[in-house]
Each structure stands twice: as structure tokens, then as C-alpha cells.
């Protein structure tokens, strides 16, 4: 944005804490952030801001009284922000001016005093004023008058110097004000800004600065000083304080400003000697304060650190000091010390070797020198021994005579006594080195403890014997055998070579790597006098611990476990519970066992008892799976009855201790035990089986009760139907998954459990299917007891029809129906009432009863339907479309007096003249379920025990299609006319629209599709066990064979008419 752009308003956007703010200026549709920082200085300088912030809020607006004023611009706000940041930019010049005026007054007073004293003697006064300093230095006069005169002159000179320094500082402050923008031409805008928003301090500073400038511009010396100060580069002239307010675009200037005091641009007290060299020094190109050498180009530099971080400011590292030199390499100091010690030692060895050379004969001086060097250095002593061994073994083992010249020379060179002396000295040096190391580590006494000459002689002879054994050894000997023989010879007088104190007296070998991670091998204990090969554990990482075997000796087992990780051998001490204990034959019952803890070792001290059987059980704390390294320490998950594990040979534990997850008991250490499978939890399976058996038992009990309820009388039929309906709901609910069974399912962790659960689920599914079939058959039997397929469908779809049928059944009871229980007559429609009326001619006394009961029952049925239809609506007119045969459909027609279920093709194809035949077919359609219901009531258990899928429904469907019923069709003319009239009247009613209704999924678990091809004998012929009952049916006049033949003929004719 242009600095001269007129602003609409300025906005202070505060933070939630109202301690910091961003100053944003707005001009037209543009806005720009002008500054950011601490909010308190603005509150102090602007009265309008303090008034607005006292009211609350998170924003303060600076808006002039009139719009578009010329002084409210961006540059005016920038000058105001600079003044708020450093008020001394205007006030410093005025302050210095006041101080200069005071110094001028002092100079004048001092000059007057000096002039008054010098009135009597002008020459003396002049001479004193000019030469006071020279006289005091040369002569050193002690006269009081002379010293007083010299002090006044000195004070005068100091005041003049101070005045000059203040004048230059004032000129510098003025130059800074001009550079920042506080020029006289722009002071009017600042006056207007101060008057509009109540910036009283700004107005006062501007007034004083303008007055000062007017006075100084007349002074030629002032103008020259201003010109000199303006020659300074910009970073020196930019004055930045630590007020915490930063203008946009001046972050780098703030970072580069260093060593600046708050409120001071230059300390006037440091300008006492600023007289002669200041001008020349001011002309020099001042270096930037943060320029660093080439190797520090990436360092951002240390500016004056602000008390806050503002946007765009780069972070600085507070740990680097720019003027600090590179640190001294402390490792070089140690290496220098070590190298100096080595040099001193080498010099000492050289001196000693020179003395030995002077004492030895000249012919073998070189050999003796090397042997003496071997006493001090292990490497040189080895060289001597190896050289002599190679030479002598080559000669002792039969060297060729071809090189006789060389052999002759070497035989003259080698002497047996000298060789023997050299070997003794070499071996003695080795022993002395072992002595020094063992003495430093507080071991046993070394071999050199005795001063007796005889003991030394015996010792030397033993060393020579060991050397002869080495010489007599053939060339094919392995280096390990040589090491074994030499170690046996060296371990004389029960010498124990140990690098570390063992926990107890035990032949327990542990390889412990030193700081070089396994390059060297130390032996904790080596029993004296035993011919045991030294095992270098640094190379055998798979055998970290040598267990001495089963014995009853006192044992000590260290809790320090060894691990090999990434090819490195290391030893660590485990924490509290990451350990294992090898039990020794019942420690809690053995009084001879003493348990002690020494450091990190666990001691088991026990007296030797040969008769006690050793227990090799381990108590092992398990590890987390993701924390165990790849090793042989693996604990298999044990079965509940069988325990087995592999032998735990070594372990690679984790680097950090941890809490164990579980505790396992491992019995035995047989390696041939195979890991068992995941455990089978019998208690979980038992709960599942128990739940399944309980469910099946409840279903069987309910089915038995329902079947027993079907054998009751017709008066209790309503109660039995209610129980069967509740039973259907329960059977449908049982097909859903039980939440309790879900909770008791076995865990899915093992394969055995999964396979067992699958088999059980299959068995349960089969049982459930059988139970569903039994329930289906019982529901079919209940529908058959209802009187017909149509009544059963209507009873399932609409409760009003069921109620009307039940009411008609109750009203139509006759003495004959009450007496003959084997053949109940269920009248649920006009067709069934007509069928009952046909049996009336044999018993005339029952005719009026039948007529009276049929008509009111029809009336009641019609009223019940009309009463309930308002609640149910059109649901009563829905028909059921059976998917058993595509050519078969059932249509439901609702009439006033009855419900007639006719075949759709019969209604469409047959004329009204054939209504009598249709009536007979329909009557036969509804009469068969009554007979089958009687048979079902006599044998309920046989229906429940029936196996197969949909046999009873197939029977019902076949009955609907074939209508093979034997019933007498001969009726009287009177009843025939009445019945035909009723049928014709019912056909005159409008037929309800066709509506396909499918069986609900809640009534059966699956959709069953039935085949119509079923034998008629299965439908019409009753079982052989009911011979008496069937004989009654066939001997009756209604169901005579003659009537059956008529029915078959009608069926054949019915097929032709189609």
C-alpha cells in the first residue's frame, strides 16, 4: 500500500488474552498489517484506545471524526508506531539540549571565577590559564594557590569536552529522527493525529522537537554536525528499543540491532575522550555485527533477543556463542598422556637392554638382547621362543642333510645352555606378568614369592621339562593340544588363573565378553591339576552356559544371563523377576539348605546326600511375545492334562527388564516331547451342549403339551388354539440366535474347538430343522381342525373371521355332534352348513334345529365381519396365492352370508347353470379336513412323529385340487332348492378384486414348494390302525362307494369342461 494512501480506519486486533495485538489499516477494499506486538504501549499513548478497551472487547478501532482527512495516512501511523516503540527518537534531542545548556552555564561560571582571580595580574593569570598543566607536570609545585588554579582550569577543560560530546550526540539523535521520518514538513500531520486520538505525549515531543530544530538551524556548527552524522550507515542510525512492538518489514533490523540499551543511542559518559579520533573513526565502514567466518555461513546470528516471537521472526539457537573458540579435544590430551608414558617406558627398556648387551659376550649379544627385551615385552618374548622352537624342532625331527652348510653354521651359533637359559627367562617373564595381574586383582600369591635358591632351581627344572615336552611334540599336533599341555604345566602348585571372583566353589565356566564385545575370553574358575581343555566361549555362541550336570554338590547359579545379539557376546544383570531357579530336591523341606543372596548371585549350599533324588523342574517367568529375541528359550503353551516342553539350553533375553505375563511350570527336560496343540476347553463346550440340550428339551415338552391339548373336546378347542398360537410364536422366536448362547460359545482360539463347535452346530441345526418340521405339522393340524384351508388362511390373516367361525361353531353344536366325538362337524361357512343340512332327512327332528342355527350363524358371521372391517380395512379381502402349482389359484370372495373359496378357473369358465355341481365340489373341498381333523385328534402322536417335509400340506393341496371325498350327494328337493338359492344369491354379489397373498415368512422358516403329483390313495385312504373309524366313515350313507364313483365322474367331466 502506498505510504500516502488515505485510510478509512485502523484496527487493533487483540489476542484472547488481550496482551498482544496486530495493527491493521483499511483503505477502501484493501487492508494491510502495519505492526504487531504488545498492546499496552498503545493504551498508554492513546486516550481513545484506553477508553475503548475499558468497555471490553477484542478489537479497538481508530477512526477519525471526518472521512477522508488528509493527515490520516499510512505514513502518519508508521511515525506514530515508531514513536510508541522508542519515544526517545524525538525526546532525546530535547533532553540533550537541556543538558548542554546546563553545561554551558557551568562553563561560564567557572570562566568568570578564573577571570576574577586573574584581574590583579593579567600576565600571571594568562600564564596560569594556559600553562597550568605543563607546570604541574614538570615542576610539581605543592603551593596551595597553584593547585587551586590548576583544578579550576581542569574543570573548565572537562566541561568543554562534555559539551562537545553532548552536541555530537544531539546531532546524532536529530539525524536519527530525520531518518525515521520525523521531518519538519510532516509534523503537522502528527499534530492532527495527536489531537484527534488524545496522544498528548506525542504532541509534546513534536512541539519541543520543532522548537529545537528552529533554533539549531541558525547555528552553522549544528548543521555541520548533522551532515557528519548522516554519513553513518543505516544500521548504525536505526534506533530500536525493546518495547515489544515491531513494524512490518523491519524484523531484520531488529535482529541485527545488538548491544543497544533501552532509551539510549549512545552513552554520553563514554565520550570523554571523543575529541580527536572520532571524526576519522566515524568515516570508517563499520562492519555488520553479525558477520561470521565462512565456516559459519548458516548461523543466523545473535541479535538483541526480543521478549516475544512475532510472525516472520526466525528462531535462534541459544547454545552457540559466536565469539567462542573451537573446544579443545579432550581425547587428544589423554592420547598425548598415554603416548608420553609409552615413550618413557620405551626409553627405559632401551637403556636396560643396552646395559644387558654390555654385560653379555659379543658372540651372542643379539640373542641376549632379545631375551632381555622379552622380560619387559610379551611380544618380544614370544618371538624369541617361537624362533628357537622352530629351529630346534626342525633339527630334532630329522632335517635333511642337504643344507649341511647352514646347519653347520647354526650349530656353531646355538648353544644348549644358552637356549635353556633363554627359555627359562622367557617363561619366567610370563609368570611375572601373571603375578602382577593377579596381585592387582587381589588373587593368590604368585610363583615368585619364595627367595630360596633351591626352590628356584626346581622351578626352573620344571619349566625346562615343559619346554622339552613342547619340543618333543610331533608336527601334527593341534594348537589346542599344545595349549592344553602348556596350561597344565603352568598351573603348578594349585595355581588358579582367574579374571573375576567366582560366587562360590564350583567348576562353573561362564564366558564373559569385555568391552570389545567378545574378543577376549576370561575364565571364572579353573580347578587346579585337572587336564581340562580350555573352551573359548567367544567362538561358541550356542553354548554360553556349561551346566556341570546332576550332582548333589553345593551349587551357585548366577542371575547374570548371557545373550548373543548381532554377533556380539554380552552379559547383563537381569532385574527383579526376570530369572529362573533350578530347584534342588525340595528346598522348603530340606533343613540342610542355606539360602543367601550375595550381590547378583543366588547361592544354594547343600550338604552332599547321595540318596536324595534331584528335582529338575524349572520355574520360568514367561515373556511377552514381541519382547523375546530369537533364541532357543521357548515355552510352549501346555494342555490342561499333558505337560511337555523342550529343553531350555540358552536364552537371548531382552535388553530391558519387564513384568512377566504368566507363570508356567515345566516338568522334565526331555527333548523328544513334541509341543502339544492348543487346549480344548471342555467346560466351555459343556456349557454350550447343556444350553443346546436344554433348548431342545423345552421344545419337545412344549410340542407334547400342544399335541395333548388337541385331544380335548370341542368346547376346549379355542383354548388349544390359543396355546398353539403361542407355541408358534415361541418356535419362531427360538429360531433366532440366543444372546446367552453367544456369550457361552467356546473361544475361537484353537482348531480343535473350532472343529468341535462346527460339528455341534451342524447337529443343532439338524435338530432345529426337525423341531421346525414338527411345529409345522402341528400348525397344519391346527389349520385342518379349523374346518378348511380357507378358514385357516382367514384365521391367520384376520382375527375377525376366526372369531366369527368360533362363534358359529359354538352356536351350531347339536346333540349328535356332542355324542359322536370321533366325527365332529365344523361349520365355518355356508357350504359346511349346507353339508350338515343334507344329513337331516334321516333324522327329521334335527332339521329345524339345523336351519335355525345355520341362518343366525351366517348373520352373526356377517355382522362380525362388518364390525371388524372398520379396524382392519381391506386386509380381509386379501387372497393367498400358493406357489405349489402354477395352474392352481385360489380366489377369496367375501359375501354376506358365507365365505366361498372357488378355483379361479372355475369362476371364469363355468356358467351359472352348473352351480349345483360347483357347490358339490366345494362342499367336498371343505368336508375332508373335518374328517382328517378327527383322525389327527385320535392320533396326535403319530402326526408329531411323522418325518417328512410338507406331507400334510401336500395332502391339503391335493384335496383342493382333486376333491376326492366320498360323501352322499342325494338330498331332498326341499333342501336342494334352499341351498341352491343361497348359492345363487351369493353369486349375485360383486366379487372382490383379486389380491395375491403369500404365506408370511414368520409362520415358517423356509419357503416350501409342493408338487401336486401325489397319489389319491394317500389322501382318501386312512391308516390301517384306524380300521374301525374308517369303516364307520365308509359305511355311512354320506360316504358310500356309490357317491365316490359319482365324484370321480364329476372330476373327469370338470377336466373336460376346462
UniProtKB/Swiss-Prot annotation:
Give the motif span (Nuclear localization signal 3).
764-771
Motif Nuclear localization signal 1, per the record, lies over: 340-347
Give start-end ranges for motif Nuclear localization signal 2.
431-438
Region of interest called Disordered, as start-end residue ranges on this chain = 123-147, 262-281, 330-463, 708-887, 1020-1041
Q: Which UniProt keywords apply?
A: Activator, Nucleus, Phosphoprotein, Transcription, Transcription regulation
Location(s), subcellular: Nucleus
Its domain of life reads Eukaryota
Q: What up-regulates or down-regulates this gene?
A: Triggered by light. Repressed by COP1 in darkness.
Q: Where is the composition biased (Basic and acidic residues)?
A: 447-462, 757-773, 860-869, 878-887, 1026-1040
> Where in the sequence does UniProt note compositional bias of the Polar residues kind?
126-136, 262-276
Q: Where do Acidic residues bias regions lie?
A: 403-414
- BP GO terms, sorted: anthocyanin-containing compound biosynthetic process; chlorophyll biosynthetic process; positive regulation of DNA-templated transcription; response to light stimulus
> Where does the record place Low complexity bias?
783-808
Comp. bias regions, Basic residues: 340-353, 432-446
Q: What happens when the gene is disrupted?
A: Defects in light-dependent anthocyanin and chlorophyll accumulation, as well as defects in the light control expression of light-inducible genes involved in anthocyanin biosynthesis and photosynthesis.
Q: Which residues carry this modification: Phosphoserine?
A: 477, 915, 986, 992
Listed GO CC annotations: nucleus
Q: What does this protein do?
A: Exhibits transcriptional activation activity. Positive regulator of light-regulated genes, probably being a direct downstream target of COP1 for mediating light control of gene expression.
Q: How does it assemble?
A: Interacts with COP1.
What is the protein's name according to its record? COP1-interacting protein 7
| Lineage, highest ranks first | Eukaryota, Viridiplantae, Streptophyta, Embryophyta, Tracheophyta
Gene encoding it?
A: CIP7
